[in-house]
């Protein structure tokens, strides 16, 4: 369970920094406008449940993710509040904290995944995907939209991401649709994130 919680935390933490142009398929103009509004939200928080499933093992954790422009904090806990983990991240440093264990440090969350869980995964796109955004620097190889013009399926970096349960939230005067459920699949690995609440523009 500890290895799974480490992986869940670090998958979430990976790649929260970075910005560049996209290649591959181009989203339609209405979707591009929506994405530009989302990218303008520099601070946000989500509360929910994150799960992972592979042929070898599976597990889940309660998640709180607080994002600021240049740093973030992620809290995860296993069933009944056991195995609490905290990730603290800045542009050039990531720290994993767990009660009773020495802190683990690295320059990136990808490095910590390898150190803590023994997995090597291309996960720098996840912080974009969670907001319903295609990740920068990575070609879009597949894109399907809902009747409302929002992403229902995205294919990028050999992952397939399914979106559902969109709900409206406000950032100032701007109304934004954000996903309530995300399923990401890569070969025989599946991540499921159920988001109970979004808070936009937190400080």
UniProtKB/Swiss-Prot annotation:
Keywords: Cell outer membrane, Chaperone, Lipoprotein, Membrane, Palmitate, Protein transport, Signal, Transport. Monomer. Transmembrane segments: none annotated. Pfam families: LolB. InterPro entries: LolA/LolB/LppX, OM_lipoprot_LolB. Its main location: membrane. The gene is lolB. Residues 1-18 form the signal peptide. It is a lipid-anchor. This is Outer-membrane lipoprotein LolB. It is found in: Cell outer membrane. A lipid is attached at residue 19 (N-palmitoyl cysteine). A lipid is attached at residue 19 (S-diacylglycerol cysteine). GO terms for cellular component: cell outer membrane. GO terms for biological process: lipoprotein localization to outer membrane; protein transport. Belongs to the LolB family. Plays a critical role in the incorporation of lipoproteins in the outer membrane after they are released by the LolA protein. The keyword Transport applies.
């Amino acid at each position: 369970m500890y290895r799974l919680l480490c992986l869940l935390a670090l998958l979430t933490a990976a790649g929260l920094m970075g910005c560049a142009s996209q290649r591959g398929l181009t989203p339609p103009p209405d979707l591009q406008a929506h994405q530009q509004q989302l990218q303008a939200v520099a601070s946000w928080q989500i509360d929910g449940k994150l799960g992972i499933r592979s042929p070898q093992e599976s597990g889940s954790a309660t998640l709180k993710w607080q994002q600021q422009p240049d740093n973030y904090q992620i809290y995860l806990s296993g069933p009944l509040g056991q195995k609490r983990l905290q990730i603290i991240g800045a542009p050039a440093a990531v720290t994993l904290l767990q009660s009773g264990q020495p802190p683990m440090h690295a320059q990136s969350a990808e490095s910590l995944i390898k150190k803590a869980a023994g997995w090597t995964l291309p996960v720098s796109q996840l912080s974009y995907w969670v907001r319903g955004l295609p990740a920068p620097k990575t070609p879009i190889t597949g894109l399907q939209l809902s009747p409302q013009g929002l992403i229902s399926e995205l294919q990028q970096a050999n992952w397939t991401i399914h979106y559902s349960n969109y709900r409206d939230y406000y950032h100032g005067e701007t109304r934004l649709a954000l996903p309530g459920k995300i399923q990401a699949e890569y070969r025989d690995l599946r991540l499921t994130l159920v988001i109970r609440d979004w808070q936009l523009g937190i400080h």
